[in-house]
Amino acid sequence: MNTQDLAKLRSIVPEMRRVRHIHFVGIGGAGMGGIAEVLANEGYQISGSDLAPNPVTQQLSQLGATIYFNHRPENVRDASVVVVSSAISADNPEIVAAHEARIPVIRRAEMLAELMRFRHGIAIAGTHGKTTTTAMVSSIYAEAGLDPTFVNGGLVKAAGVHARLGHSRYLIAEADESDASFLHLQPMVAIVTNIEADHMDTYHGDFENLKQTFINFLHNLPFYGRAVMCVDDPVIRELLPRVGRQITTYGFSDDADVRVEDYRQLGAQGHFRLVRQDKEILQVTLNAPGRHNALNAAAAVAVATEEGIDDQAILRALESFQGTGRRFDFLGEFPLAEVNGKPGSAMLIDDYGHHPTEVDATIKAARAGWPDKNLVMLFQPHRYTRTRDLYDDFANVLTQVDALLMLDVYPAGEAPIPGADSRSLCRTIRGRGKVDPILVSDPAQAAEMLASVLTGNDLVLVQGAGNIGKIARHLAEIKLAPQKTEEERHG
């Protein structure tokens, strides 16, 4: 951003007083990196630390940020404030050093709240669909020429970034309930896509506590703000009378203010009508598959309609929507002659979904778009606590595929829990008699084991939130073909 643009922005959004150098602990995470990127473009000096380089840290380095691939006390020297990821423990040496030096230490959401303070904030919350809905709202506002700032938890593929600094007063951001830090945000508009039991350790295992936290989040809206809520979700429907703000509902339900009708899916596109109160019916072509994405689009349209955005801009944005990274991400279609000698081909899809509801939605989208394909899933459970808490739900959902390969649980720092491991989950699924799971204990063998179950007319879903995305990219690079050893190559 040039000096003239920065001065124009300052007239809209005052800078943080006396803050010059902002240090991020855990800067490589998508949410942290996105905020750092916006602040770097606003002219702040950015530094940060993480354990290893990734595309987020590479992008920030190109913007002039100083990145350390270690955690040392000296990294926070001269920082005005330290921003910490929820994944970072209190005994991290940089956090300890910041406290000793009386440097303010704040959570990611507190910094996001500062970015939002002087802007028209639109926050997207909910157990599932936040990232895609944030991208859809951002795409519509950009198509309408409103040049929003956005901060997303996933890569917005059309922009090639997780976050972008716009020149207008609009800020569109994903709001994270995992550590309840979204309570720091004070948006003008808030979307809640759905509410399910997840991250229950934050809420002391009390679902009522989780529900009340969402109510408190919505009551951060000003009295003239608006809550946009999915009435199809039974928990949201239950909570509606407790929300003391203006509400727009959306969903497939007959009483939704923005109603999805006549949904059908052709390949990777959804086609449906959106019926709005006192507005023209929209005939939507959405470049994203699945009924769940139609709901995400309905939420985005509800917000855009409230803002008075032109219908044609809305329709163009949805039809050209490029999606987000690792959300039903098409990585290619590969001939099987080079994989296992069989005629035919296999499509490869990478998806971040790691909760049973998300996995179910991905499977349904795959079945609806490609009903004749042999559906093969390579799945990596994420966290032992989630596997334990949702064990039966995972077992039920994963029986819907034709072939299932399962990696070990990605621990995300958790200690193993007996009975909540992949071997136990495979045993339970096998006992239900619908699919015979294959346990992939060594990720290096994933390609070879995957090749053994391909039939010649396959759709391969690589599913999970841990490091399985790297495996998906590797499978795409080798075009699903297992790499032969020297002995195999030379007979």
From Swiss-Prot:
Q: What does this protein do?
A: Cell wall formation.
User: Its Gene Ontology biological processes?
Assistant: cell division; cell wall organization; peptidoglycan biosynthetic process; regulation of cell shape
Q: Name the species this protein comes from.
A: Klebsiella pneumoniae (strain 342)
Q: List the disulfide bonds.
A: none
One Pfam family hit: Mur_ligase_M
- E.C. number: 6.3.2.8
The family note in this entry says: Belongs to the MurCDEF family.
Query: What is the protein name for this chain?
Result: UDP-N-acetylmuramate--L-alanine ligase
As for subcellular location, the record says: Cytoplasm
